[in-house]
């Protein structure tokens, strides 16, 4: 986004769903140093942001009204807790976050976890965690962008969307984007998959 819109401001809101201190996130440090995020906001029990807020609502309002952000990215920091059960993972907070964005008049865009690197079947294609959030937790319709993969992988993703009726509940947007790796290299960012 920043590469094509360098004058736009991006705020990152870190929730308290994982590590609480912002400084533990090397990704945030790198993104801020590269000018890819302009301000940080920690909410709930998380701390160390440029701004600290009580909850997701005050965090979103701070991003828009005080930080003057054009785009707000919300995510937990490093680490995640999970119990191996359908509803027992801290990433379930994504549902309430998307609801809050919509309630405050924003445009909720849900980024699904999609991977083919993890050999566990439940993490092939769209992760079962993302499916749970989009099917059972979020109460509003959201935009879900899906990068177009090679046909076999894309067919798996489309099958999951249809099987869980996510294509009926939400706005699925297929994106032809071969620039992700190029953009990561351009900004000197290194990412890895579970």
Which residue stretches match the model-derived regions?
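Conserved beta-strand scaffold positions in the cores of enzyme catalytic domains, especially
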Residues: 12, 40-42, 108, 143, ...
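Glycine-rich anion/phosphate-binding loop at the beta-strand->alpha-helix junction
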Residues: 36-118, 123
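Phosphate-binding glycine-rich loops and their immediate beta-loop-alpha structural context
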Residues: 1-56
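C-terminal functional extensions of proteins
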Residues: 117-194
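Generic alpha-helical propensity signal that fires on short helical segments
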Residues: 28-30, 58, 124-128
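Electropositive phosphate-/nucleotide-binding environments in soluble metabolic enzymes
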Residues: 18-21, 25, 50-53, 91, ...
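Acidic-enriched, low-complexity/disordered segments with a strong bias for Aspartate over Glutamate
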Residues: 7, 16, 38, 50, ...
């Amino acid at each position: 986004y920043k590469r094509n819109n360098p004058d736009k401001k991006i705020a990152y809101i870190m929730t308290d769903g994982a590590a609480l201190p912002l400084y533990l996130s090397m990704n945030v440090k790198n993104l801020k140093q590269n000018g890819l995020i302009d301000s940080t906001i920690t909410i709930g029990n998380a701390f160390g942001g440029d701004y600290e807020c009580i909850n997701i609502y005050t965090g979103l309002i701070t991003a828009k009204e005080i930080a003057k952000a054009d785009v707000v990215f919300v995510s937990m920091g490093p680490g995640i807790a999970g119990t191996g059960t359908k509803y027992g993972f801290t990433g379930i907070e994504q549902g309430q976050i998307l609801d809050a964005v919509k309630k405050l008049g924003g445009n909720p865009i849900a980024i699904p976890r999609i991977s083919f690197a993890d050999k566990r079947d439940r993490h092939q294609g769209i992760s079962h965690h993302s499916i749970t959030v989009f099917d059972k937790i979020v109460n509003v319709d959201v935009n879900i962008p899906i990068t177009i993969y090679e046909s076999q992988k894309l067919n798996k993703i489309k099958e999951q969307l249809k099987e869980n009726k996510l294509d009926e509940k939400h706005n699925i947007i297929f994106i032809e984007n071969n620039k992700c790796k190029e953009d990561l290299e351009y900004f000197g960012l290194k990412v890895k998959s579970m």
